[in-house]
Amino acid sequence: MARKNLLKGFKKPKGLEFAQQESTESYGKFTASPFETGFGTTIGNCLRRILLSSIQGYAISAVLITSHDADGVPHTISSEFENIPNVSEDTLEILNKLKQIRLRLSDESEQGDFHFEFKGPASITSKDFAVEGQLEILGEPFYVMELMKGANVSFDVQVDFGRGYVPAEVNEKYIEIVGTIPMDAIYGPVLKVSYAIEPCRVGQRNDYDKLILEIWTDSTVRPEDVLGEAAKIAKDHFSIFINFNENDYLGEDEDDNEEAVIKQLLATSINTLDFSVRAKNCLDSAGIKTLGELAQKSEDEIESMRNVGRMTLNEIHAKLAEYNLRLGMTDYSHLKNTIKVSRQKEETDEA
């Protein structure tokens, strides 16, 4: 049994600050304070480890390479140790370059197979593996291989959605076509994470922690999105250790902070909500970044936005209703009286 007022007097961050001016598709800087002494390091290290090891992404998991001679007769390159005729680079070197390609499927599906044909003389770069409307190649293009005169080679590439690092030995178990070469797949889209702790003053005390978190991704996903995913993973793992009903032990300080909780809810990023790609793109184009900004829009304003149809409008209504919100809520006092903050929303969604 937990003690009453378990968190009374315990300092917790009021929200997350996002450095908008410094952010890009591949970089984000976040600040949260105040934490009790030591908690900044605990939270920062936990998020860093999850971000680097457990975020999902896309990678090439297998490739079938076929060379064609002058008469068009095909020959399958059976392993990474067999070289491709009239290609300057070793097959192993080419496979290493393919591992480095950062990509994503346009329809957000979990697997895709793509066929590419190249003839020499030509210099092939990472961008040559893009398929319009289906397979996006992110980042600056880089050199993959040089095809000499007479080279005629095709690549059948399998792209998978996964988590972390999966060695070729594991991917080999799922190969069905003889001659397909399994590859080490690095799915994680997070390239680098660093955090720093600075002293933070609250009242007369200056020994609280301020957590500064910096995230670099490969541009396939935005830093604020992967941070939300990492926090969700951590929360779900910690929840099994709670052996009491949290609603029965809400401290008085949480009741006093109702307004702060509502503000935090309204500051929720649209990118962290489970909207469809179409709805997200419409809201992003209209400059709507948070749940509060969306709730303040009228239905007429939403309908006038580009590419918003009836299905997208219904989706927005349904999403706002999950938080007991609706379109056209512009009076803050009205929000405070009508919003019922569900402290266990995510647990209910999953149950």
Swiss-Prot record:
Residues 1-245 are annotated as: Alpha N-terminal domain (alpha-NTD). Homodimer. The RNAP catalytic core consists of 2 alpha, 1 beta, 1 beta' and 1 omega subunit. When a sigma factor is associated with the core the holoenzyme is formed, which can initiate transcription. CDD domains: RNAP_alpha_NTD. Keywords: DNA-directed RNA polymerase, Nucleotidyltransferase, Transcription, Transferase. The keyword Transferase applies. Belongs to the RNA polymerase alpha chain family. InterPro entries: DNA-dir_RNA_pol_insert, DNA-dir_RNA_pol_RpoA/D/Rpb3, DNA-dir_RpoA, RBP11-like, RNAP_asu_C, RNApol_insert_sf. DNA-dependent RNA polymerase catalyzes the transcription of DNA into RNA using the four ribonucleoside triphosphates as substrates. Residues 262-351 are annotated as: Alpha C-terminal domain (alpha-CTD). Gene3D superfamilies: 5' to 3' exonuclease, C-terminal subdomain, DNA-directed RNA polymerase, insert domain, RNA polymerase, RBP11-like subunit. GO terms for biological process: DNA-templated transcription. GO terms for cellular component: cytoplasm; DNA-directed RNA polymerase complex. The gene is rpoA. One of its GO terms (molecular function) is DNA binding. It comes from Treponema denticola (strain ATCC 35405 / DSM 14222 / CIP 103919 / JCM 8153 / KCTC 15104). The keyword Transferase applies. Its EC number is 2.7.7.6. The N-terminal domain is essential for RNAP assembly and basal transcription, whereas the C-terminal domain is involved in interaction with transcriptional regulators and with upstream promoter elements. HAMAP family: RNApol_bact_RpoA. It catalyses: RNA(n) + a ribonucleoside 5'-triphosphate = RNA(n+1) + diphosphate. This is DNA-directed RNA polymerase subunit alpha.
